[in-house]
């Protein structure tokens, strides 16, 4: 029977802690830090709810975050990393392409310039 009370206390402790911290914050005289504290608690609670829903744990967020083996966060990070690599490869490819076309244009320009110069020198002599 004591084990039942221990489980009951552990599973409902997170809800009690949030309520107690809000009531402690409302008992203060300064309203500005209290509003920031309550807003921070609400936003943090929403973020944690979204994370536990993505992990598929339902209402039992403690067990879901500890024992879940989900790669949803790492998959998003891998996609971002892959896009950066693709961008780097494309920028290197365009740099090589610009270098090759620029090199060819320079070679053709110098060759044509030398040809015209030699032709004009040939005509003068």
From Swiss-Prot:
Disruption outcome: Displays a weak budding pattern phenotype in a systematic assay.
Keywords of this entry: Signal
Signal sequence segment: 1-19
Biological process, per Gene Ontology: cellular bud site selection
Tree of life domain: Eukaryota
Note: Partially overlaps RPL22A. Disruption phenotypes caused by deletion of this gene may also be a result of a defect in its overlapping gene.
Designated name of the protein: Putative uncharacterized protein BUD28
Recorded name of the encoding gene: BUD28
